[in-house]
Amino acid sequence: TIPEMTARFTDKLQEREIPYIFIDSNVPSLNPLAFFGQKSDQSGYFAARMAMMLGEYPQGIVIFRQINEGRLGSNQQENREKGFRKYMQEHFPDCKIVELNLYAKRPDEDEALMNRFFQENPQITCGITFNSKVYIIGEYLIGHNLKNFKLIGYDLLHRNVSCLKEGAVDFLIAQQPTTQGYSGIKSLCNHLIFKKEVKSCNYMPITLLSVENVDFYLDAHKK
């Protein structure tokens, strides 16, 4: 599992008494000095609420999943999906959730998989992905002139932002990565040099970005 793979490295750091922090994705059981990132399950819970509003409360919704070596790409993605499903079970238990797995090491199959999905599921007009590659779906929608599909993704990769501005992605959820990195280094400095107490868990705001506000966000977070 992802925590087990991470533990192989952090165990060596602990043996050498080297402090470490986690950024973006947390594994609390590995006892990092600090964590900076979103509360992943709450982020997924929030994303579900936004997706249902965006899709005008559809009867079905698709989760586009990025699979790497037989599993989701990160612990964070798993927790986002858990939060998403929790919201749906609590508020829209009758909404059908469909999964479409795309494979990180077989990108040449993406188009065929999405062709089949959209042909077989014309009633589903709303989707979400919990990884940073929403552009894969967004660029497909642009290339096939599918203008009525509603889509939410994560992270401000250049291609994601381009899809947002072209209307293929409706919302991006941002995580303030620059702030995460800066705060993480600051925590290490405070711990190692100034011998200060460091807060162990530091959640970042869940920021929803649209074409109307994304440039302001990008300008505000330039360093």
Where are these regions (language model features)?
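Hinge/beta->alpha junction and helix N-cap segments in small-molecule ligand-binding domains
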Residues: G37-S43, F64-G83, C95-A112, T129-K133, ...
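Hinge/cleft segment of the Venus flytrap/periplasmic-binding protein
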Residues: R71-L72, M88-H91, Q176-K223
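Flexible loop/hinge segments that line or gate small-molecule binding clefts
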Residues: R8-Q42, H158-K165
